[in-house]
Amino acid sequence: MATTNYSMIFIGNLQVAVDRSSLYESSDYSSFVARECLNKDSAMKPYDIFIFEKDEHFSVEDHYTAGNSSNESNTRPSDIFLKKKLVGLNPSILQLNREKRKATLKFSGDNKDILQSTLSSSKNINLSGGLFVSREYENKYVKFGARMRCDLVNRMKDVTLAWHESVSSTSDKNVELSSVENHKIAPKADGPGNSSNESSSSPFDIFLKKKVMRLKPSFLELNREKKKAAKGFSGIVIRPGMVLLKNYLSINNQVMIVNKCRQLGLGEGGFYQPGFQDGGLLHLKMMCLGKNWDCQTRRYGEIRPIDGSVPPRIPVEFSQLVEKAIKESKSLVATNSNETKGGDEIPLLLPDICVVNFYTSTGKLGLHQVSVYDKTSFDFLKYKGGYLNTDKGESKKSLRKGLPIVSFSIGDSAEFLYGDQKDVDKADTLILESGDVLIFGERSRNVFHGVRSIRKILPPRLFFRKQIFNQVV
């Protein structure tokens, strides 16, 4: 199709495409198009777009009389609307509301009423183009454009085209960026409220605002997961003082932990993104329970210096699960050890500090040891595309006793690193899945540990189903 001076004329809900170099300069052309479009008996349909070839020099009147002559094939314009049905998705309510607000801002006075009337009467109609005349023709055909809008309101049910945004705008595309992700940590942390950005940011919800397209689980898959849950957990002694309890947490307990973490995370002292004095931010969201851990001073305290909030209390259910898991690990160590006092490898612990870390799909945590200022450690691992991790350490006296760190994994699988040296290449790897509990104390108390990556492996479907119906808001 050879057109050299092509332009689009937006007339009401019509788009008339014209090669101006191949038309006679007639001031009555636009009026003729309008009359033809509004004439029910006209051969020119409201949804037609005509492209005139450059070498075809004829008037508009000649075009419509030529269709009845034998030379129709030589003068008939090319129609870019091919004879096939277009299949598309219906716009969402959110998209329609956003476009209504955009369009409303562009109109004023009577035009705004016309627009609202048009949009409200076209629930089942897909529109194409904007309800305005293009800038190029706005001054010349403003009356004609207004007339077309009024007439098309009453004839909207006869028009079936595809809706798209008339005016592109980037103003609405940046409002969904998380203020938590972009905030900067104040260089000092010696008092509350040092970061105005953090204190004013909205609470972070670990239920991420995105839809995950998943197929409905088959009965075979559901039965397999039920059998796995009924089978119970299995214990593995990784190294002296380190025990992995596979599939230890029941689905109900996993749902309970996630819902309580979400509920606490949306309140005072909830999830935030910690950082350092140089402005660097950790690749996770953190919430402290019992006491606050300051990553800059590496000390625990009664308040969070960044905003002065008081950490929530540790739920009783969490402490009960920790105590029960440690007893199971002691029993496992005693069974697998040749030593008569093998069960003393992992001391009993009643946690008083819980650091909950939430990782998204790109989250990670470098190799580190629990500081000598830590009080206790308790790890949750990720949920639904995120990753939760908590550390509970103790003072020097507690470190000498080898009080353990307890890590609960919930959600997607995580690649967990551990080793005696702070060297990623020499570190060993464990894949922690939803429901796993990892405990390391005594001789493994000072082991370096971290999270390399979050794997795109979703937790059991039963977990999702129970979470949907039992979530605490």
Swiss-Prot record:
Give start-end of the signal peptide: none
- Reported EC number(s) for this entry are 1.14.11.51
Gene3D superfamilies (UniProt xref): Alpha-ketoglutarate-dependent dioxygenase AlkB-like (2.60.120.590)
Binding locations of Fe cation: H368, D391, H449
- This protein's superkingdom? Eukaryota
Alphabetically, which GO biological process terms does the record hold?
DNA repair
What SUPFAM superfamilies has UniProt attached to this entry? Clavaminate synthase-like (SSF51197)
Summed up, the tissue specificity of this protein is: Undetectable.
| DNA repair is among the record's keywords | yes
Task: Quote the cofactor binding remark.
Answer: Binds 1 Fe(2+) ion per subunit.
Report the catalytic activity: an N(6)-methyl-2'-deoxyadenosine in DNA + 2-oxoglutarate + O2 = a 2'-deoxyadenosine in DNA + formaldehyde + succinate + CO2
> What cofactors does the UniProt entry give for this protein?
Fe(2+)
GO CC, alphabetical: cytoplasm; nucleus
The alphabetical list of record keywords is: Dioxygenase, DNA damage, DNA repair, Iron, Metal-binding, Oxidoreductase
Q: What does this protein do?
A: Dioxygenase that may catalyzes DNA N(6)-methyladenine (6 mA) demethylation. Requires molecular oxygen, alpha-ketoglutarate and iron.
Q: What name goes with this protein?
A: Probable DNA N(6)-methyladenine demethylase ALKBH1B
User: Upper taxonomic classification of the species?
Assistant: Eukaryota, Viridiplantae, Streptophyta, Embryophyta, Tracheophyta
